[in-house]
């Protein structure tokens, strides 16, 4: 009997280097700068259909920020936040704006197209907003 060798590798840890950018190169570059603290852009919102890598980019940005000892807050699936969670994110945004740190958030649609509280949608749209495109 011959033993078969299966080529099974563990899932790669999300990094900005292993994200396949495709048409999302500008968004990726902005995240690299923000998560390393080398830009004035401190608020980034990513949106698009599932499978575009939003969660990968959030996790990778958080890891890079830790390497640079940068305070970074991420918010995934903003479109699914409850009223209380939206208020908490709004307050977090304002605290970061008055102090230091970076906020990267993502959702399924542009900030003003998700039925979020008006104050939160406005804040999310104040920063850099990128629609992520899936690879074809």
Predicted feature residues:
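Conserved P-loop NTPase "ATPase switch" module shared by AAA+ and STAND
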Residues: 69-88, 92-95, 99-109
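Short regulatory helix/loop adjacent to the ATP-binding pocket of P-loop NTPases
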Residues: 111-125
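Interdomain "pre-motor" coupling segment immediately N-terminal to P-loop NTPase/helicase cores
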Residues: 1-5
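Dynamic helix-loop-helix/coil hinge segments at AAA+ ATPase domain boundaries and subdomain interfaces
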Residues: 6-28
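P-loop NTPase Walker A phosphate-binding motif
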Residues: 55-68
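Walker A/P-loop nucleotide-binding motif
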Residues: 40-57
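Phosphate-binding P-loop
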Residues: 33-41
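Conserved AAA+ ATPase "SRH/arginine-finger" region at the nucleotide-binding site
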Residues: 127-136
């Amino acid at each position: 009997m011959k033993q078969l060798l299966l080529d099974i590798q563990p899932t790669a840890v999300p990094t900005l280097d292993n994200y396949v950018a495709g048409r999302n190169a500008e968004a990726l570059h902005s995240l690299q700068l923000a998560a390393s603290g080398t830009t004035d852009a401190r608020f980034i919102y990513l949106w698009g259909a599932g499978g575009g890598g939003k969660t990968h980019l959030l996790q990778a940005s958080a890891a890079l920020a830790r390497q640079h000892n940068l305070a970074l807050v991420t918010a995934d699936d903003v479109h699914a936040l409850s009223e209380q969670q939206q208020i908490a994110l709004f307050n977090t945004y304002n605290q970061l704006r008055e102090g230091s740190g970076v906020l990267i958030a993502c959702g399924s649609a542009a900030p003003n197209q998700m039925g979020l509280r008006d104050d939160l949608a406005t804040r999310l749209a104040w920063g850099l907003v990128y629609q992520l495109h899936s690879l074809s």
